[in-house]
């Protein structure tokens, strides 16, 4: 906790140029490689090898003979799986759905996080500590637990909220159409506000206080200081949290999968790209196609993150 | 920054797939010994058996005592990922000889080449089981396992509420629709049936009962027919339930699903033997108000029900398929084994797939659940004897079912009709089979 509350150094402007590294001799380079060996081995074993395996899987397809019961053959089919994925309407629909949903939800979540961080920045230090801890609680609760908690609140058969609404004489529903997204968005925002607020708050703390004094001398009110000084100086962290959240949304899996238990007709098995991949691999048993889908998702996510970073960075500078 | 937490969640799935990888690296000795066995093996052998049914382990001990020649090593494979573990074990060459699996998975495993053809060594046991049960272990006409249990379809309904709304237990599906409408005239909120948004099994049951054949093996190819008159007749009942809002849509995965019936908002359900043991805990408020009846029929003169089957599949690489079949047949058909397993004390929840179930019915009925107005034992025995034996699982049934699940949700939300779904599934299934190198044509 203490490490979180301490203001972190955030790169808002490009720091002074680092001195160019000393030309290391061959021996030095060799030693350097040795130091990175543990990392490299782990990286190879847990990233490169599985991705390579997935890639080789994705170049194959399972074929049967006769009536289809009995031995199967795994045959090399080149990029045929990738061609199918690229033309797979359901896969791209899930991607579009997740992106559209994510862009709205992330904007709302970061907006609230920013607002709270700015408010916290304006109050006394003791209160800050309390509110920070309180707002961080949703993040501390394991995602599965908090999703289950919301699941009980949303459940069409057992929700206390529905009971209350019924007693008040109205009928509400948490799923179907736009409601599905509102319910899921509420859950993700509830989970995400605390952590994003901490990051934004930390970078606010790192801003030099003299700026505010100067602004006050010039007659600026608090909201003006917030809008014209604080926000422009923390765009770096906003872009960063935005990008991380975007990547997170494209990998959205556990929450909708759990929510599907109570709203299967609203959250389909291909609701998000990850759910579609999971279904293909573990329900249908088509590992090869699922591997191709995973790789396409990874590449698409990488491109999107890059574009997002480029576009937002250009706009800010 | 919730992507960390999302990742943590996703890592559950990742861990599952990683364990597959690790398992795949683990073994590797002689996985290619899957020659078709015809002769009996000799000498003393030990074979591994996976199951997750309560009470089975005790039975294997009984067997082991009586059969020193064939020793069974029991492994409790309980868990959500049992089938995934089994797949990984086969690929790694460390699979057990015999494993519990449901009929749908048996077909799925067989289609993926993960089972052993035991047609020749198992033929001698065929007569012990119902024709429908033997079909379930013989997809495409090749036998890959031995039937274990069945769960024939019948109806349970709230007799108290039926009386209150002035309706009777429906004899046909049309009766059910009419009764549902009549009940809604008395109470707008009441539903006569439930169809979960994730679960097209209602349509499977209806189609099975109507005599439809989604998959039919003909010589060297499959005839795929989701739009035959029988299939459409079944689909039409679902459509009427949806159009008239006669069914609730409680998901079977919803923790509160049983409240729907216990509180009386939904007043009837089709059900089966495997559910009987859980009634007592799940229906505390409506205990004693229930009554059993035959499932609604399409043709009361020719009653036909459906059933899921529990099976024992013989896996690829099993060296002693004859012994595995012998043990499996003893476990699932001998009087000695079934008397113990159908006793509620064993907690197996098993209902046998043998031709004569009458000795085992009485004990599985939770008497305090029902009002005693109908002969529960007769309902269950009849349902078991009426299971239609035309139903076949095709080689891409699991993939088809997953595709159907996606569209089923849309049907429940009235975005598409059942007929549109069936038409599109038929095309999808034929294309998918042809894609996998299997000959298939659309039926009608």
Name each region found by the language model.
Chain B
Residues 142-148, 153, 177-224, 230, ...:
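Extracytoplasmic/periplasmic solute-binding protein
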Residues 221-250, 295:
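Glycine-centered hinge/linker elements that transmit conformational signals in sensory
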Residues 274-286, 299-403, 440-444:
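C-terminal lobe and pocket-closing loops
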Residues 88-89, 96-97, 126-161, 191, ...:
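A structural signal for short loop-to-beta-strand junctions that line the ligand-binding cleft
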Residues 103-153, 205-207, 291-293, 377-379, ...:
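Hinge/lid segment of periplasmic solute-binding proteins
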Residues 2-108, 123-125, 250, 299, ...:
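Conserved N-terminal structural module of periplasmic/extracytoplasmic solute-binding proteins
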Residues 163, 381-444:
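Conserved C-terminal helix/tail region of periplasmic/extracytoplasmic solute-binding proteins
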Residues 59, 230-237, 319-331, 421:
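Short amphipathic alpha-helical coupling segments at ligand-binding clamshell hinges
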């Amino acid at each position: 906790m203490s490490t979180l509350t301490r203001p972190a150094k955030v790169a808002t402007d490009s720091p002074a140029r680092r001195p160019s590294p000393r030309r290391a001799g061959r021996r030095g380079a060799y030693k350097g490689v040795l130091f990175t060996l543990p990392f490299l081995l782990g990286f190879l074993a847990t990233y490169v090898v599985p991705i390579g395996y997935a890639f080789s899987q994705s170049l194959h397809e399972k074929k049967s003979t006769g009536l289809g019961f009995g031995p199967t053959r795994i045959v090399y089919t080149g990029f045929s799986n990738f061609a199918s994925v690229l033309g797979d309407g359901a896969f791209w629909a899930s991607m579009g759905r997740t992106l559209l949903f994510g862009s709205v939800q992330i904007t709302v979540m970061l907006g609230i996080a920013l607002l709270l961080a700015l408010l916290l920045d304006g109050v006394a230090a003791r209160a800050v500590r309390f509110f920070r801890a309180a707002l961080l609680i949703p993040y501390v609760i394991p995602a599965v637990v908090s999703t289950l908690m919301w699941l009980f609140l949303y459940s069409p058969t057992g929700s206390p909220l529905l009971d209350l609404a019924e007693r008040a004489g109205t009928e509400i529903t948490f799923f179907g159409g736009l409601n599905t997204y509102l319910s899921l968005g509420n859950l993700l925002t509830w989970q995400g506000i605390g952590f994003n607020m901490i990051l934004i708050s930390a970078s606010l703390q790192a801003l030099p206080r003299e700026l505010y004094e100067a602004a006050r001398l010039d007659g600026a009110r608090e909201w003006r200081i917030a809008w014209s000084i604080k926000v422009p100086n923390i765009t770096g962290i906003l872009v960063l949290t935005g990008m991380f959240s975007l990547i997170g949304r494209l990998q959205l899996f556990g929450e909708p999968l759990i929510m599907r238990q109570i709203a299967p007709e609203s959250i389909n098995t291909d609701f998000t790209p990850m759910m579609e991949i999971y279904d293909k691999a573990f329900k249908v048993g088509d590992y090869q196609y699922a591997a191709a889908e995973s790789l396409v998702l990874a590449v698409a996510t990488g491109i999107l993150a890059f574009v997002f970073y480029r576009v937002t960075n250009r706009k800010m500078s | 920054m919730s992507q960390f937490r999302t990742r943590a969640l996703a890592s559950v799935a990742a861990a599952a797939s990683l364990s597959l990888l690790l398992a795949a690296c683990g073994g590797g000795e002689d996985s290619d010994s899957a020659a078709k066995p015809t002769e009996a093996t000799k000498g003393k052998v030990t074979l591994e058996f996976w199951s997750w049914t309560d009470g089975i382990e005790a039975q294997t001990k009984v067997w082991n005592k009586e059969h020193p020649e064939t020793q069974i090593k029991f492994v409790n494979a309980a868990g959500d990922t049992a089938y995934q573990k089994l797949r990984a074990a086969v690929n790694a060459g460390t699979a057990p000889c015999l494993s519990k699996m449901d009929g749908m998975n048996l077909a799925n495993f067989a289609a993926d080449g993960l089972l052993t053809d035991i047609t020749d060594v198992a033929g001698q046991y065929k007569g012990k089981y119902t024709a429908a049960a033997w079909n379930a272990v013989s997809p495409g006409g090749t036998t890959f396992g031995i039937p274990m249990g069945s769960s024939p379809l019948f109806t349970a309904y709230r007799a108290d509420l039926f009386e209150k709304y002035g309706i009777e237990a429906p004899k046909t599906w049309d009766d059910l629709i009419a009764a549902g409408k009549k009940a809604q005239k008395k109470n707008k909120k009441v539903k006569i049936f439930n169809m979960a948004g994730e679960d097209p099994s209602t349509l499977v049951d209806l189609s099975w009962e109507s005599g439809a054949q989604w998959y039919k093996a003909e010589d060297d190819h499959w005839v795929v027919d989701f739009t035959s008159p029988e299939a459409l007749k079944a689909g039409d009942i679902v459509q009427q339930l949806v159009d008239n809002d006669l069914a609730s849509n409680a998901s079977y995965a919803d923790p509160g699903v049983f409240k729907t019936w216990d509180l009386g908002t939904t007043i009837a359900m089709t059900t089966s033997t495997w559910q009987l043991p859980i009634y007592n805990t799940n229906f505390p408020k409506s205990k004693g108000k229930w009554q059993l009846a035959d499932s609604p029929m399409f043709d009361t003169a020719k009653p036909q029900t459906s059933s899921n089957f529990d099976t024992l599949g013989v896996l690829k690489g099993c060296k002693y398929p004859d012994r595995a079949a012998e043990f499996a047949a003893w476990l699932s058909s001998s009087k000695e084994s079934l008397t113990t397993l159908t006793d509620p004390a064993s907690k197996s929840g098993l209902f046998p797939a043998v031709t004569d179930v009458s000795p085992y019915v009485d004990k599985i009925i939770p008497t305090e659940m029902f009002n005693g107005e109908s002969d529960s034992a007769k309902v269950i025995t009849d349902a078991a004897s009426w299971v239609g034996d035309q139903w076949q699982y095709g080689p891409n049934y699991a993939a088809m079912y997953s595709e159907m699940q996606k569209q089923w949700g849309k049907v429940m939300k009235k975005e598409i009709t059942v007929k549109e779904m069936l038409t599109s599934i038929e095309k999808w299934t034929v294309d998918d089979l042809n894609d996998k190198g299997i000959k298939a044509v659309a039926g009608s």
